[in-house]
């Protein structure tokens, strides 16, 4: 399990690791066909919406200062894992994140992602 935790935590925060992708095609490969997300706002986002947003985000340079910590990994089913962690954005906003990852024959795919704002 330690190896899987290391592999998956290196990919988080998802969609913000240039080494794993910056183009729509790369993000399509990274996400399951039925991927969906619940944002920190509580809104539900479709795969299409997320892909459109990522395409816009990576069209211009950006400088996010994000820190991830407190990673945990739990096996949900054969080749399916829940990864949870804390994300600190620009030293101000703290969210708890959860991503469901599925191991495929040649890579990892994201089935689901959720962010929840931590209130003081």
What are these model-derived regions, one by one?
Residues 2-29, 34-120:
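A beta-strand edge to alpha-helix "cap/lid" segment located at domain peripheries
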């Amino acid at each position: 399990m330690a190896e899987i935790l290391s592999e998956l935590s290196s990919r988080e925060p998802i969609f913000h690791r240039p080494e794993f992708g910056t183009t729509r095609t790369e993000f399509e490969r990274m996400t399951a066909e039925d991927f969906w997300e619940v944002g920190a706002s509580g809104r539900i986002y479709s795969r299409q919406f997320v892909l459109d947003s990522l395409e816009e985000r990576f069209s211009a340079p950006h400088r996010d200062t994000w820190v991830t910590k407190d990673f945990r990994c739990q096996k949900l089913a054969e080749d399916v894992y829940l990864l949870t962690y804390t994300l600190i954005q620009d030293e101000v906003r703290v969210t708890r994140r959860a991503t469901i990852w599925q191991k495929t024959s040649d890579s990892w795919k994201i089935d689901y992602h959720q962010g929840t704002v931590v209130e003081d």
